[in-house]
Regions:
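Long, highly hydrophobic alpha-helical transmembrane signal-anchor segments
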Residues: 23-54
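Residues that define the loop-to-transmembrane-helix transition and helix capping
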Residues: 34, 57, 170-171
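Interfacial loop at the N-terminal end of multi-pass membrane proteins
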Residues: 54, 70, 85-91
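Polytopic alpha-helical membrane-helix bundles and their juxtamembrane interface segments
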Residues: 2-30, 81-82, 92-204
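Hydrophobic alpha-helical membrane segments of integral membrane proteins
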Residues: 38-42, 58-62, 151-155, 174-175
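Alpha-helical transmembrane segments
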Residues: 54-70
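Membrane-water interface at transmembrane helix exits
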Residues: 58, 74, 78, 114-118
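Membrane-water interface of transmembrane alpha-helices
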Residues: 65-83, 192
Length: 204
């Protein structure tokens, strides 16, 4: 049972700031707006600190070692595709073969990372590792505007919102990720509509 009075008393301004930055970041992504990457930088840095304080080592490393440079890379890729903020990089899908390859790459990555984290005293090492591995895949596919990246974010947001963050008593972030779960579903539907016809499949 959640003690909401205690949760509000222990509310971290840092966690609130991270949640706001992340919410804006994802909303802009749903709208296919290039400024998603700027807010992504703020979100990554703030949540990196939040996860570090909570001893979620895989998630901390994910923020600083992968997400942060990927924000710069994603920004560059989208800018290169077109000069305006509503850029011209097309929304596409993975080929069936590429989907299999990415799945086969993601699951062993999660298993290996979970095994390594089990020696570090990390909290929730296996689920943290799974979230990290799926996030790595999702972020790369997002950078290249592959519709399948929304499936990754649906899974990640569900694992964070229903399992990982509540167990660390990060209630604001838990609520945020449940909201992000809804936004990910909306983003998936919006991008499917925006993709248009005929649909294209390009390997990555």
């Amino acid at each position: 049972m959640i003690d909401w009075q205690r949760a509000l008393h222990e509310l971290s301004p840092l966690e609130v700031a991270a949640a706001i930055a992340t919410l804006v970041n994802v909303w802009l992504l749903v709208r296919n707006n290039i400024w998603t990457w700027a807010w992504g930088v703020a979100s990554v840095v703030l949540y990196g600190i939040v996860f570090w304080r909570s001893k979620l080592w895989s998630s901390t490393g994910l923020q600083f070692l992968y997400y942060l440079p990927m924000q710069a890379y994603g920004w560059w890729v989208w800018l290169r595709a077109g000069p305006t903020h509503h850029d011209d990089l097309p929304i596409t899908r993975l080929t069936p073969r590429s989907r299999v390859v990415w799945t086969l790459a993601t699951l062993p990555m999660a298993a290996l990372l979970g095994w390594l984290m089990s020696f570090t005293g990390a909290q929730q090492s296996m689920i943290d590792a799974l979230v990290t591995a799926v996030s790595v895949t999702g972020q790369y596919l997002q950078t290249h505007k592959k519709i399948e990246h929304w499936f990754c974010w649906v899974a990640v947001n569900a694992m964070y919102g229903f399992w990982l963050l509540p167990r660390q008593q990060l209630w604001v972030s838990s609520a945020l990720y449940l909201l992000l779960l809804g936004l990910a579903i909306k983003g998936w539907r919006d991008w499917l509509r925006e993709e248009g016809a005929p649909q294209r499949s390009i390997a990555v």
